[in-house]
C-alpha cells in the first residue's frame, strides 16, 4: 500500500452487477451520464456499532461481512488512554479490534483495542485485499474531541492517515486541484466513479450522544472538525485532513444554515446523517440531498413503517427495506443486520 499521505502527516465491486463502470469524469460540470455511474448514485447497507463482540467476534469479521458502512464509537476524555472504542465504558476500550500486524493476525491476540488497533486491523485487511469495495467508517465521538490530551482533530488526522495512508479517500481527494471546498466539488464534478473508489476507506464524523447532551460543550465534533478543515485549506494543507464531518440529525431545508453560524464552514459538509424515520416522515425532502450530490446516511432503517426487527429481520424483509429506502434517496441504510451477509453486500441504484 502506498503511504505517501502518511509521510505527509509525519512531516507536518458489487455495484458493477447493477451498472457498468465508466472512466473518471473530466473536470467541469458533471454530465447526466457521469452521474449515473457516480459513487453517490449507490445505496448500500451498514452495521450499527460494528465494533461490539456480540455483533462480530472480530473487526475483521465486520470488514469481511460485505457491509459498506461500519461504525466505531470513540471516547477521548482524560479518564483513560488514547482513543477508546466502546459503547458505554468511557475510560477503557471494549471492542472486537485486535491491532493486527498482518492478515494472519486478524483473528488472534487480545481484543479490546482502541482506535489505533482498529485502524491496524483495517490496514492488515486492506493489504490482503487492496481491491475491496469502498467502506465508510462512521466515527461517533461520544464525548467529542479532547485536544488537551492529544485527541483533537489534527491528532485524529495523523493517526488515520499515518496508519492507512492512500487507502483513505479524503476531502482533498474529492476537491482535487480544481475546487476549494467539497461542496463545490460535488456540485460541479460530483463524486468519483464506483470503480475509482475501489480499495478506499471514507471516514465520517458525527457528534456523540454524550457531547450532544452536554450543556457545557458549545462546539461539537462536526463544527470543530469542519473549522479545522477550513483552516487547513487556508494554510494550503488540506491534504492533511482525513475525514468528512457530517451534519447530524434531520431538519427541513438546508440544515447547515441554522446549524452553523459561520458560513465559511458550511461548504465542508457533504454528508448528512439521521434517522430514516425522520427523513421519510414527509417533513423533509430527501431528494434535496440527492439532487445536490450529497451522501445521505439513514440510520435505524428498520423503524420505518412497517417496522421490522433491527437485528433479526429476514433476508427478504431487509432487502425490501434497502430497496424502499434507495427509492427515498438514501446513500446508506444502517441497522444491526450483521447476520445477513447477502443483504450487507448488496449495492443498488439510488433513486
Show the residue positions of the predicted features:
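Catalytic cores of phosphodiester-bond hydrolases, prominently lipid phosphodiesterases
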Residues: 31-351
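Secretory targeting and sorting signals
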Residues: 1-29
